[in-house]
Amino acid sequence: MIKLVYCITKKSGLTDREFFDYWKNVHGPIGTRIPGLRKLVQSHRLPVPGDKHQPDRQKFDGIAELWFDDVEALLAARQSPEWQTSTADEANFIDHTKVAYFVSEEHILLDNLSPQP
């Protein structure tokens, strides 16, 4: 299983609320139709009052994680009309000059999210 990770920044002129609402409720359903996509997660930035550890250089507003079986499935998905529709829609809420992405393989070192007996 591989994961495509997008670090995104909202388009200028959008409030946080407008950005997160559009991303989740309009763009999100578009993304769920991408063929071969096994899992889709959005992580929306939360402000932390007094946080001095946020870098001043690049500030992202969120992260999208798209899981595929393998790189071949990702490459096939990128050729699909659904991917093209999703990419075109990004212009409505993302500043493409402030985006970073990479393909990764997850290595879980700790998972205490499951209830313990």
Kindly label every feature range from the protein language model:
Residues 1-117:
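Macromolecular interaction modules
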